[in-house]
């Protein structure tokens, strides 16, 4: 009876650690997005265009996700959803990087696509944490 309780506690600890790891990755992924959105809003209120120097934020996001997917739970989830991974993390970021370089990110069409990209990131992170 004691071994079963110890095994159950051990399993709960492992589940908690995986959840904490996924939550930490979610926070790390969210920080560049918060900075990106805040800088976009501040610059659009001031009537200025976003400079090319701020585009590495998107590249940083992609690098962080690529590093983060090496975790077992995240890699397992993404390997089951290859099409979602390709749609979310391959098509949209390069489209935005191109738009960002041409200073078109404040265009309404580009901003709507950016919001769709954010929603897809949140959906993918939620699937990973569940």
Curated annotation (Swiss-Prot):
<feature type="transmembrane region" description="Helical">
    <location>
        <begin position="105"/>
        <end position="125"/>
    </location>
</feature>
<keyword id="KW-0812">Transmembrane</keyword>
<keyword id="KW-0472">Membrane</keyword>
<feature type="transmembrane region" description="Helical">
    <location>
        <begin position="25"/>
        <end position="45"/>
    </location>
</feature>
<protein>
    <recommendedName>
        <fullName>Uncharacterized protein IRC9</fullName>
    </recommendedName>
</protein>
<keyword id="KW-1133">Transmembrane helix</keyword>
<feature type="transmembrane region" description="Helical">
    <location>
        <begin position="50"/>
        <end position="70"/>
    </location>
</feature>
<dbReference type="GO" id="GO:0016020">
    <property type="term" value="C:membrane"/>
</dbReference>
<dbReference type="GO" id="GO:0006312">
    <property type="term" value="P:mitotic recombination"/>
</dbReference>
<dbReference type="GO" id="GO:1990414">
    <property type="term" value="P:replication-born double-strand break repair via sister chromatid exchange"/>
</dbReference>
């Amino acid at each position: 009876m004691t071994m079963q309780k110890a095994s159950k506690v051990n399993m709960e600890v492992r589940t908690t650690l995986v959840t904490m790891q996924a939550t930490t990755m979610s926070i790390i992924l969210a920080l560049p997005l918060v900075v990106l959105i805040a800088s976009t809003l501040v610059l659009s209120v001031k009537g200025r265009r976003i400079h090319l120097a701020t585009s590495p934020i998107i590249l940083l996001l992609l690098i962080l996700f690529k590093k983060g997917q090496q975790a077992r739970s995240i890699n397992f989830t993404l390997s089951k959803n290859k099409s979602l991974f390709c749609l979310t993390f391959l098509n949209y970021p390069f489209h935005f990087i191109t738009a960002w370089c041409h200073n078109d990110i404040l265009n309404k069409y580009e901003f709507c696509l950016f919001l769709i990209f954010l929603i897809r990131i949140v959906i993918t992170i939620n699937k990973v944490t569940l």
